C-alpha cells in the first residue's frame, strides 16, 4: 500500500481548498480522516509552519508558508521526513504555477483542480522511489525537524474535529521559511538609485512647500500631499524590489498609480520633462519588481 495516500493544497487564511488529488479511497476510516483534514485546514492560520495530527489509522501532515499550505494523509509507516519532503516539493511546484494574486482572488473551492496532475506525479515519485534516491532531500528535512520539531496536534484534545480549539494543547510552531529572490540585476540597481533620488526630491519639495504654506496659506495641502505620497510610494517600490511580498502585483499597481496621479496633480509646479522623468522611473521600477521572481527550488528531492 502507498505511504502517501492523499494530498491537498489550501489557502491558509480561510482553509479554502485550492486543489487536491482526485484518487479516492472508500474505507470508512479514510473518509473520516478526510473530514478531519478539511476541518483542520480551517485552523492552519493558528499553526504556521509544519505540523501533524493522528487520525484513526492515518497521520495528517501539513506545511504552510505565506498563504498557501500543503496537507497530506499518510499511512503510519510513512516517515515524517518523507512526508514533509513531499509537502515542500508540492509547495514549490504550486507557487511556481500560481502567483499570490491568483491565490488571493480564488473564490470557489478547487479553483486550481488542474494542478492535480502535478500532485499525482509528485505523489507517485515519492511512493515509488527508494530512500537512497531521495537521500539529500530527506537528510535536509530531517535536520530541520530535529532543530525545530513540527507541531503535534491532537484532534480530540483540541476539538478540531468539532471545529473548535480549546487552547490547552501547547503547539510549537515553526516560522515560515525565508523566500529567496533571484539576484539583483544592474538595471534593478539603477531603478533603486533613481527611485531613491525621486523619493528625496519629492520629500525635499514637500517639506519646503509645507514650511512655506504654514506661514502663508492652507490651500497648498493638496500639493504637499502630492509630493509626500509619491515619495512614500518610491520607498515602497524599493522594498518590493528587494524583498518578497504577497500580492506584489496589486501593490506595484497601487504604488505606480499613486506616483502617476501625484505627478499629474503637480502639473503646475513641474514641467513636462520633470513629470515624464518621475513617471518613467516609476514604470521602470514596476517592471523590475514584476520580473524579479523567486529563485527556483533546488531539485534535491528526486522529483
Swiss-Prot record:
Protein name per the record: Vesicle-trafficking protein SEC22c
Report the leader peptide range.
Answer: none
InterPro entries referenced in this protein's UniProt entry, alphabetically: Longin-like_dom_sf (IPR011012), Longin_dom (IPR010908), Sec22a/c (IPR043546)
Q: Where is the Longin domain?
A: 8-119
Spell out the SUPFAM superfamilies in the cross-references: SNARE-like
Q: Could you tell me which residue ranges are on the Lumenal side of the membrane? A: 205-223, 270
Gene Ontology terms: cellular component: endoplasmic reticulum membrane
Swiss-Prot/TrEMBL keywords: Endoplasmic reticulum, ER-Golgi transport, Membrane, Protein transport, Transmembrane, Transmembrane helix, Transport
Location of the protein in the cell: Endoplasmic reticulum membrane
Instruction: Give the UniProt family note.
Output: Belongs to the synaptobrevin family.
In its UniProt entry, the species of origin is given as Mus musculus (Mouse)
Instruction: Extract one GO BP annotation from the record.
Output: protein transport
**Which Pfam family name is an example for this entry?**
Longin
Cytoplasmic compartment segments: 1-183, 245-248, 292-303
Q: Where mainly located?
A: endoplasmic reticulum
Amino acid at each position: 500500500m502507498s505511504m502517501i495516500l492523499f494530498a491537498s493544497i489550501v489557502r491558509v487564511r480561510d482553509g479554502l481548498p485550492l486543489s487536491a488529488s482526485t484518487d479516492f479511497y472508500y474505507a470508512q476510516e479514510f473518509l473520516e480522516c478526510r473530514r478531519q483534514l478539511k476541518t483542520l485546514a480551517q485552523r492552519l492560520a493558528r499553526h504556521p509552519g509544519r505540523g501533524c495530527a493522528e487520525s484513526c489509522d492515518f497521520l495528517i501532515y501539513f506545511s504552510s508558508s505565506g498563504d498557501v499550505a500543503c496537507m497530506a494523509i499518510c499511512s503510519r509507516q510513512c516517515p515524517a521526513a518523507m512526508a514533509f519532503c513531499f509537502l515542500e516539493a508540492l509547495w514549490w511546484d504550486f507557487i511556481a504555477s500560481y502567483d499570490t494574486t491568483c491565490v488571493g482572488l480564488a473564490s470557489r473551492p478547487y479553483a486550481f483542480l488542474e494542478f492535480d496532475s502535478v500532485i499525482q506525479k509528485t505523489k507517485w515519485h515519492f511512493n515509488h522511489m527508494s530512500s537512497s534516491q531521495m537521500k539529500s532531500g530527506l537528510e535536509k528535512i530531517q535536520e530541520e525537524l530535529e532543530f525545530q520539531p513540527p507541531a503535534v496536534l491532537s484532534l480530540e484534545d483540541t476539538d478540531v474535529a468539532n471545529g473548535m480549539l480549546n487552547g490547552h494543547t501547547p503547539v510549537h510552531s515553526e516560522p515560515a521559511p525565508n523566500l529567496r529572490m533571484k539576484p539583483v540585476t544592474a538595471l534593478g540597481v539603477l531603478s533603486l538609485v533613481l527611485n531613491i533620488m525621486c523619493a528625496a526630491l519629492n520629500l525635499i519639495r514637500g517639506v519646503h512647500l509645507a514650511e512655506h504654506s504654514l506661514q502663508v496659506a492652507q490651500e497648498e495641502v493638496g500639493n504637499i500631499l502630492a509630493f509626500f505620497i509619491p515619495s512614500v510610494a518610491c520607498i515602497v517600490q524599493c522594498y518590493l524590489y528587494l524583498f518578497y511580498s504577497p500580492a506584489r502585483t496589486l501593490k506595484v499597481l497601487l504604488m505606480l498609480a499613486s506616483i502617476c496621479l501625484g505627478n499629474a496633480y503637480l502639473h503646475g509646479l513641474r514641467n513636462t520633462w520633470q513629470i515624464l522623468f518621475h513617471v518613467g522611473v516609476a514604470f521602470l521600477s514596476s517592471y523590475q519588481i514584476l520580473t524579479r521572481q523567486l529563485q527556483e527550488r533546488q531539485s534535491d528531492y528526486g522529483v
